[in-house]
Amino acid sequence: SISRRAYMLMANLIGDKAADLEMLNTDEKPSSLYNLSADYTVVCFWDPNCGHCKEELPRLDSIYRASWKNHNVKIFAVLTPEGKTDVKPEWLSFIKDHNLSDWTHVYKTKEMDAADQAAQRPSFRQLYDITMTPTLYLLDKDKHIVGKKLTLLQLNDLMQVKWNKTPSN
């Protein structure tokens, strides 16, 4: 509905503080977006069965390792299927096969989703307007939204601007 769509868009305006994401990491331990200390945080919403994600995530990691990591940028990667389907084996395999161990990877269990619904808490899909994958956000050190729904090129250009460099063409 239009009101639902408006709610999703209003929940994450540029300049606003991003909603915290409290999920489980690959070791089944709680992990929070707000506890990730970095000058900039890239929040990447993705699905290991998404063809576009399979292409973009290795490219994202290459840019991260070549440039961003040296500027205290961290990547907080959120598994998007939300426990509806069990893609955990594919998720863990993709992380391992592509050596994405420098990132913080998180997911929600079916039970966590059910608890959020029972408490009428909005899902991360609502809070971050996730309608496709991959979806990339850039947050500053205080977790304010600097850019949202960015392409990899836009994200890299925005980083270059933040570091007072010339963006790529």
Pin down the residues of each PLM region.
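N-proximal helix/coil linker or "cap" segments that precede and/or mark the start of modular domains
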Residues: 1-24, 34-35, 65-66, 89, ...
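Short active-site neighborhood of thiol/selenol oxidoreductases, capturing the structured segment around
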Residues: 31-60, 74-76
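Loop/turn elements at helix/coil->beta-strand transitions in domains of secreted/extracellular proteins
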Residues: 37-41, 70-74, 100-103, 141
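Active-site-proximal beta-strand/loop segments in catalytic clefts of secreted hydrolases
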Residues: 45-47, 78-81, 108-110
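Structural microenvironment flanking redox-active thiols in thiol-disulfide oxidoreductases
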Residues: 55-98, 113-123
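Thiol/disulfide oxidoreductase modules built on the thioredoxin-like
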Residues: 110-161
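Sec-dependent signal peptide cleavage junction
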Residues: 163-169
